[in-house]
Amino acid sequence: ATGEILALVTSPTYNPKLLVGKDRGKNYAQLFRDNDKPTFNRAIQAAYPPGSTFKPSQGLILQQEGIITASTMYPCHHGFVIRGMRVGCHGHASPLNLRPALTTSCNAFFCWGLRNMLNNRKYGSIANAFDVWKNHLVSMGYGKKLGVDLPFESRGFLPNSKYYNEHIKGGWNANTIISVSIGQGEILATPLQIANLCALIANRGYFYTPHLVKRIEGVGVLKRFATKRIPTIDPKYYTEVVAGMRGAVIGGTCRRANIEGIEVCGKTGTAQNPHGRDHSAFMGFAPMNNPKIAVAVY
């Protein structure tokens, strides 16, 4: 995955011919006032809860911080249940480790993982632990503009400890914010950021700034698009995440992405939508080894 954008699709769309000729001003005004916002490029400007497409990033962070290993097991009793609080999940084997947790998209596994990280005394405080968690995500391209060569890119949103100190009355703890572990709560990402995470995993530890223009005549390849960006995660921790995403396609939550003769790796996502039906998402890359393409659909 080289960062080259092969397709960037947003819907609803409009006929670009409307923006040429003598009526272009009137046509643009009509498009701008359209309630469906056809001029709004949702692929880079909209920010949505990433849902379970966020879980691979959590698997990487929890390994990097020594909270889990490939064999660490957490229980799931149709969800994460603690002190009267519940985050639901579906039926599958329990307990389970990281690989099947990704394959089955287990909510409880990642809730337990984040809770154990935030409550770990090595960080000194929950605020410090949360900011370590957040900084890993920033290094992966979340919570900031990736730098695509198009205007008006959104940075999405990642909260930090200061945000919670200011917005949660009476204080906060791991249980208060546990939904961020599964890509909900305050977490927002653009579809491009989700695709970029997938490219990072496909490359096992690096990504390039997403771009439409590869080279300019007389200038050559643009350096900022040819420079590897390396997050804070050791490359050895990608192995289990890739295996879990491959398992999701073979016999997990995204079997429809299985293509005969091509080893596809993928991750589905569902996120609550306060405005209507739940959001659905998918990210994937192929082939598993020597990958050529990464995709995200929201």
Predicted feature residues:
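Beta-lactam-recognizing serine transpeptidase/beta-lactamase-like catalytic domain environment
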Residues: 1-53, 57-298
